[in-house]
Curated annotation (Swiss-Prot):
Species whose genome carries this gene: Clostridium acetobutylicum (strain ATCC 824 / DSM 792 / JCM 1419 / IAM 19013 / LMG 5710 / NBRC 13948 / NRRL B-527 / VKM B-1787 / 2291 / W)
Chain sites annotated for binding ATP: 177-178, 202-203, 259, 281, 290
PROSITE patterns: THUMP
CDD domains listed in its UniProt record: PPase_ThiI, THUMP_ThiI
The protein, known as: Probable tRNA sulfurtransferase
Pathway assignment: Cofactor biosynthesis; thiamine diphosphate biosynthesis
Length: 384
């Protein structure tokens, strides 16, 4: 009798046809990466993955956060002996401490002499006979006893939800515009959850923003590596660009012109590093630069797709996800970033593209962008 972790992967993977094996292979690699430093072995039995390890609680905590994992269950592995199956199912109900139960069987091993309905009926009757404190509830049981009969039998009563999604690094690359706020880390998480490899770019305005602000962004990236393993963070010096904009452009146009520079720089880095897209944490109408007109004007600088996974979400929903993934408490630390300094009193909310292009024509945009990219710092962030 052994305790193992059974891994059920996202149903989308089953829909990949001839590519399913590729997705499974990458998911298995990602699970192994998540378990770095933990002693474990993979066991495969008739279409199910199992993990054998010394510290299953630690294994559960790591594997449940791997994109592509739908569910994990700590199972008891036993021989295909019906008396043993009945006794182990009885024990599972007793250990649950619940008052109602139901038995569900998946008989993948068609050589087993009883079919699934017979197993459910006989095991349920055995539990009732040997435990007078419980009763059957087939519609809403407090304890669901799952029996999977394969080369061996696996019994479990507790399911732990995974994060679902697609296996990481199966769907291209994006450069996330990562600030120190609540939104952009959530956007990065949501892109990664769809299998997109995520790197980050942070615009640093020293000395107006402190090293603590930069450290905060590094900490946010590190939290994301809990889900993606590692992340490259590009830190771009942005002060010279901001000073030029402040000196030569109208105050009410500062924000949108700064956003256009950020977009241009992000696209240049993405091109240089072979990334197909840029991602942001923008949500329509949330701030002055995120009106429909503002997004159109900033998008004008993009030479590749710009993904905004939060575009239609309310702030409260974004905050809920931020708490769930563990970035919220870091995001609300009171360190200013380049987006919160030099904010005009009355920024334009309906910028006109032609006017903004004309306004920034007084700047040597190409030189400013190239200088910033040339001076950028590259930091590798890994899951500790």
């Amino acid at each position: 009798m052994n305790k193992l972790l059974m891994v059920k992967y996202a149903s989308e993977i089953f829909l990949k046809g001839l590519n399913k094996n590729k997705f499974e292979k990458i998911l298995k690699h990602n699970i192994a990466t998540a378990l770095n430093g933990v002693k474990f072995d993979f066991v495969f039995d008739s279409g199910r993955w199992f993990i054998k390890g010394e510290d299953l609680e630690e294994v559960v905590d790591r594997v449940r956060n791997v994109f592509g994992v739908a569910e994990v269950c700590i199972v008891t592995e036993i021989e295909n002996d019906f008396d043993t199956i009945k006794n182990q199912a009885l024990l599972a109900v007793k250990e649950s401490g619940k008052g109602t139960f139901k038995v569900e069987t998946n008989r993948a091993n068609k050589g087993f002499p009883l079919n699934s309905m017979d197993i459910n009926r006989e095991v349920g009757a055995y539990i009732l006979k040997n435990n007078d404190e419980v009763k059957v509830d087939i519609h809403n049981p407090e304890c669901l006893v799952n029996i999977e009969i394969r080369k061996k039998t696996y019994i479990y009563s507790k399911r732990i939800k995974g994060v679902n999604g697609m296996p990481y690094k199966t769907n291209g690359q994006t450069l996330l515009m990562l600030s120190g706020g609540i939104d952009s880390p959530v956007a990065g998480y949501m892109m990664a959850r769809r299998g997109v490899e995520v790197s980050g770019v942070y615009f640093h305005s020293a000395p107006y923003t402190s090293e603590r602000a930069k450290d905060k962004v590094k900490d946010l990236a590190r939290i994301l590596t809990k889900y993606i393993g590692e992340m490259t963070l590009y830190v771009v010096p942005f002060t010279d660009i901001q000073m030029q904009i402040i000196e030569k452009c109208r105050e009410d146009e500062l924000t949108i012109i700064m956003r256009r520079f950020m977009m241009s720089i992000a696209c240049k880095i993405a091109e240089d590093k072979g990334m197909e897209s840029v991602a942001t944490g923008e949500s329509i109408g949330q701030v002055a630069s995120q009106t429909m007109q503002g997004l159109v004007v900033s998008n004008d600088c993009a030479d590749r797709p710009v993904f905004r996974p939060l575009i239609s979400m309310d702030k409260i929903d974004i905050m809920d996800i931020s708490r769930k993934i563990g970035t919220y408490e870091t995001s609300i630390l009171p360190y200013e970033d380049c987006c919160t300094i030099f904010v005009p009193k009355h920024p334009k909310t309906k910028p006109i593209l032609g006017q903004i292009r004309k306004a920034e024509s007084v700047l040597d945009k190409e030189k400013l962008i190239n200088d910033a990219v040339e001076k950028m710092e590259v930091i590798q962030i890994k899951n500790d």
